[in-house]
Amino acid sequence: GKPTTMTSEQLETLLRNTPVNRVEKAEVMYSAPPELHVRGAVINVVIKRSHDYSFQGELSTNYQNRYFSSGGANGNFRFSTPKITLDVMYGADNIKTMEYTDLLSRHTLNNNVYEIMQNEKLSSKSWMHNVRTALEYNFNEKNHLNVAYTGSFTPDGHNRSIADGSFQQSNLDKFTDNKMNNITVQYSSGIGLEVGGDYTRYTSDNSQTMFTQLSDKSKNSYTLTGGQRIDRYSIYADQKHNLTNNWGIGYGISYRYAKDYDFQTYDNVSGNIKPENTEAGLNEQTTGFYFSLNKNWATGTSFSISATGEYYTIGNYHKWAVYPQASLTYLKGPQHIFQLSLSTDKSYPGYWDMQSSVTYLNGYSELQGTPGLRPMTNYNLNGTYILKQKYIFGLFYTHTSDYFAQTPYQATDRLALIYKNTNWNYMRMIGANVILPLSMGNWYDARLTLVGMQARQKCDCFFDVPFDRKKWLFIGTLDNSFKVGKNLSFELIGNIQTPFIQGTLDLASSFNLTAGMKWNFAKDRCSLTARCSDISNSSMPDMKVRFKEQYLDMDSGAYTRTVSLNFTYRFGGYKKQKVKGVDISRFGH
């Protein structure tokens, strides 16, 4: 298959809606081979190609209510011949959100303690337009060319923050205009060679206006104009060889270049704030190469091992790294399967997060950039035992070096709450998980998932409050499915999580109860889905800081209950395909 950015829920929907005769193979990989250009655990689904003439499509509409009502519509169409497959997709969504945050800060400054109480209302509204066109040309059974264009546009975004409290009252309005265009080309040959590349252009423009009145009647205000321009290129080449006795080798190279330009200009500044304008660029290059070896036995036992070398540079930061991947599956028999895997992963901070910038969120809170913020590297070791092909017992160990996260900090030189991404020494987790399926006849299926682990988080350079903390975490999830006839089903999902930590933050326990139904009708051409998630409005944990002289309470769970409806109509036997998504996680201000 191809890389995707689909969530696990979307992937589950895809698998349930795809008939068995359309699937060529489905593989669960706890340690993905490097030629997939993703790291960690993946599900690789390969769909059979069409060999006839057809026109298929899907029309859908959705509604969601979480304080505000949102909704959208989407259309997917596919035209297929033995040589050509053309996919066209367009979707439009009207998005409205609302969040409330209650804050209590006992801020120590010059040996005095200031109690600051604040309520902040955050709202946003926008129209998002997504378009995708993909053309696949089959030269023959084994040689294929794919060209795809993906666009995403949010032209009139409006975010508003209204804060009211004992220290300050403020009003901030932010208007945004974001555009993303991507084109991808991929060629697969019958000799095991695959080459490809893509280009992404992202532009973002925003303007802000903030007005603040402090408790001493002094006033601060500013207007701001900012933006981001990103050009990103990537190319790769992979080669696979199938050898005798079910041995296989693979090797490949890849190169990615990204050029980022950010600017932020303040104007009409008044009061006791001293903002600085930002105008900076980043040039990032990543060069990788890998070699892999795999073997399959007739008994079902298999193993694979690979190593990926990477040279990464951004600004004055240069680093060589090697990322090992290994997996072993041993079948003692169909009733007993043992799996062992080692995987590595790397996550990068957003480009704007790496700039030297300060953005004032209200009269008390500010967001600071972190020049020199490094990518985090994650190492995972997993051992799994599968009993009777359904009961799963696992052990895992995870070590993440240079882990970064955004944690609030009460400044020691002024009354300001700072949000800033910081690299930690590491985050380490060790634990176990159990998955137990349950069923009664053909009408009831359930899956109980239990996870227990201990986390250790260490950072020697978090402002003037270094930390080294440990915490046990337990998670339990029960997923129930009830079938009423062939076309109607209900689900009830409960999830509970014990208290946890994030840096200096303490996170309270949380609970999420979700109920839903799905009805297929009109000979499976139509489906109606209804769902209510977080029925008890308790999925967002309360947060607090009680660390050295830092004292902070935050509650952002005022309204998290979500009701959603989705209607889908398909014609021509259309089944939604898994497609490559464009990663824009590092874009935006």
Residue spans for each PLM region:
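Short acidic/polar hinge/loop motifs at secondary-structure boundaries
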Residues: T4-S31
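N-terminal periplasmic accessory domains that precede
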Residues: L11-T13, E27-V28, V38-S60, A73
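Outer-membrane beta-barrel translocator domains and adjoining extracellular loop/strand segments
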Residues: G40, E99-N112, S152, G157-D173, ...
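Transmembrane beta-strands of outer-membrane beta-barrel pores
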Residues: T61-Y67, T81, A92-K96, G151-P155, ...
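Face-selective signature of the C-terminal outer-membrane beta-barrel domain
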Residues: I84, M128-T154, D173-P324, L331-Q335, ...
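Outer-membrane beta-barrel signature, preferentially recognizing the C-terminal barrel domain
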Residues: L282, K346-L395, H399-S401, L417-G431, ...
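Gram-negative outer-membrane beta-barrel transporters
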Residues: N423-Q497
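C-terminal beta-signal and adjacent terminal beta-strands/loops
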Residues: F521-H589
